Amino acid sequence: MATKKTSKKAPVKAAEKKTAAAKTETKTTVKRVVAESTAKSKRVELDSKLPNNLINIVIAEVIGTFILTLAALFASDILSSMYVGFALMFIVAIIGNISGAHVNPAVTFGLWTMRKLKTVLVPFYWGAQFLGAMAAIVLVGSLTNGGFALSFDQFTAFSWNIFAMELVGTAVFVFGVAAVLQRKEIKAAGQAFGIGLALMIGLVVSGSISSYIKSTAIAKIQKDQSTTQTEKNGRTYPREIYISGVTLNPAVSLAVTEKTDSQLRSNGVLPAEGEKSYSRFSLEVIAATLIGAALGGNLFLLVNYRNKDEE
C-alpha cells in the first residue's frame, strides 16, 4: 500500500515544479519589459530637458548673430568673404564655449539632423538668431534716419540659380564645421580658425558660381538688348544681376538686400529715392541653406563613418 501512495504523488510534485518554474519565467519577463520601458522614458526626459544655462545660450546667440550681420552688411563686395570669415572666427572664440556659436539657423538645423543638438533647443536657437539679425537692422535703420528700409515683396520669388548658389555654399560650409567639431583634440582657438575658414571657403566657392551665373545673364541681356523690356516690378534685369553674393545664413539674409538699379550704376550704399530695397530673406534662401546644411553635415558623417570602417 505504501508503495502505491508514493507512485501516485510523484507526478503531482513534478507538475508543481513546472508551474513554479513557469511563474518564475513570467515574472522575469515582466521585470525586463518594465525595465526597458523605464529606460526609454528616462531617455525621453533627458532629450526634452532644457539646459540650466539656456538664457546664456540665447543671449550669446543674439549677440553673435548681431555681430555677424553687421559684418556682412558693411563688408565690401570684393573682400566680403574674408571679413565675414574673420568675424565668425572672433564670434566662435568668444561664445563658442557658451552656445557653440551657431549664429546661423542653417548650422543649427544641420547639427540637429546630425543628432548633435536636442530638438527642444532648436526653436530657442532660431529665435535668438533672428532676433540678433533684427537688432542689427534696427541699429542700421536708426543710424541712417530710416534710409535702410526693407521690402519683402520678393519673399515668394524663386530662382534656381540663386538656390543652387546658396545650397552649394552652405553644404561646403557645414561640411567644414562638422569636420572641425569631430576633431576633439583641436583646442578652442583651432576650432574658431577652422570654422571661420570653412565659411570663407563656402563663400568663395558659391561666389565663383555666382560670377559665372551673372556673366551668363549679362551676355544674354546684351544679346537681346533690342527687345529687352522692363519687368512688372520696375526692374530691368534678371534677379541674379541684383544679387551681390550669397548669404549662407537665413538670419543674415533678413538684413542683406538686393541691389537696386541706381546702386548697380553708381555702386552707392543706399538706394535712390523711390527705390525699394528687397530683402534677401526668401523661400529660395531658406530652402537652399537648410537643405545644404543637412547635406553637408550628413555627408561628412558618411565619409567619416566609412573611413573608420576601413581603419
Language model features by range: what are they?
Residues 2-311:
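Membrane-interface helix-loop junctions and terminal tails of multi-pass membrane proteins
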